[in-house]
Amino acid sequence: MKRFVIVSVLAVLLGVCNAVAQERTVTLKAASSDSTARIYALPEAVVYSGKKKSKKLANKGVRVAGARTAWTPDNLGQEIGSVVETGNIFRVQEISFNVMSNGIEDLKLCINIYALNEEKMQYCNIMHTPMYVEVPVLSAKQELTAYPTEQLFLAPGRYFVAVRMTDCDAAVKEQWSDNTMWDNRKRYSMSKQSIHFPLYLKSSYTRKGIADELEKVPVNMGLTVKGIEYR
């Protein structure tokens, strides 16, 4: 059974934060290719002159001690991330995030960037080529970094930067193929085959798979986008 686990510490905190806990469910739908919505990125080949400076795009919110989300091998395709915003043209150089631990062998994550038009309730993937990150087995917290394989410019606007669980060891996937039949003892014995991310109290989006739409949630995973801002 697919699971998106948020530990009880966060659940308690969200119960106290009524303004967050009572936030209505919001779903964004993918913009069609002929959509007139202003959701776009700038062309790769454009060269920008004038003032520029190094900058980080981050909108993490409050880190809640002990709060984390866990993915297991049956969560392939699931996404979670952070929303960032730029007021000027921005060239992405790297994207970083923390992993608390990982027990899944040969785990591969990919990063996509979705331009958001929250007024029209739409989003659009602006990347031609996703960024991939191979995650080693980890017993302690580690920062991971992904780099674009091509020039990536963002127009002024809001973006959902998402991490997706893409692939893992074939034998591990086979082990998890019948997990709906497991009893509690079996599930507990397999629980080490999971990856854990820290969570921050600031709204973002998630979705269970590429065929699903983005759904707003009151937490994010604290991604940081580093690059060059042009003015």
Specify the residue positions occupied by each region the protein language model found.
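Secretory N-termini
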Residues: P148-E150, P156-Y159
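Bacterial Sec-dependent N-terminal signal peptides
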Residues: M1-T25
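Short aromatic-acidic-glycine turn motif
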Residues: A115-Y123
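Solvent-exposed, conformationally flexible loop/turn segments
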Residues: L138-K141, P156-G157
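Solvent-exposed serine/threonine-rich low-complexity stretches and specific carbohydrate-binding patches
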Residues: C124-L138
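Beta-sheet-rich sandwich/jelly-roll-like modules and their strand-loop junctions
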Residues: Y40-L116, R158, R164-R231
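Exposed aromatic-hydrophobic patches
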Residues: K141-Q151
